[in-house]
Amino acid sequence: MKEHTVVINGMSKSYSMTGWRIGYLAAPSDIAKAVSSMQSHTTSNACSIAQYASVAALTSDESNKFIENMQKTFDERRKYMVKTLQETKGIVLPEPKGAFYVFADVSAYYGKKFAGEEVKDSLSFANLALKKGVAVVPGAAFGDDNCIRLSYAISLEDVKEGLKRLKEFLAELK
């Protein structure tokens, strides 16, 4: 299987190194050489500090502890958000399998009104929720206009506050 596998990853999300512009590839040598040749002609090299920091992130025990702690923290936020949304009338939410987002079906609220404006689709839902201080991303941007995307890549306190505001918004829909 190894000869048929290509893995491409980066340091941004796993190691909180956004902006460092470091990625890596694991692949059979012929593919790695071709990718390396293409990459050398399309991008400049990453700075040496970012390269050394990435090696340290990938090889240090301290880094592994950081990742474990971060995973636990995100899992706590995910569980709270999923439980809260699944208990909210009118929202259908499958269990998220990756990243730090949930994709909630809110179409049960379409046709209702907030401050005299009708919720017609995910974009109008997002725009009206924003008036209540809740930022969501319309699902239409991801191919499902019945849904909204919410992030739990924020503090647990902010997750709780955002969900409280979302529930207040939903309660005001008539």
Residues of each region from the PLM?
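PLP-dependent class I/II
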Residues: 1-174
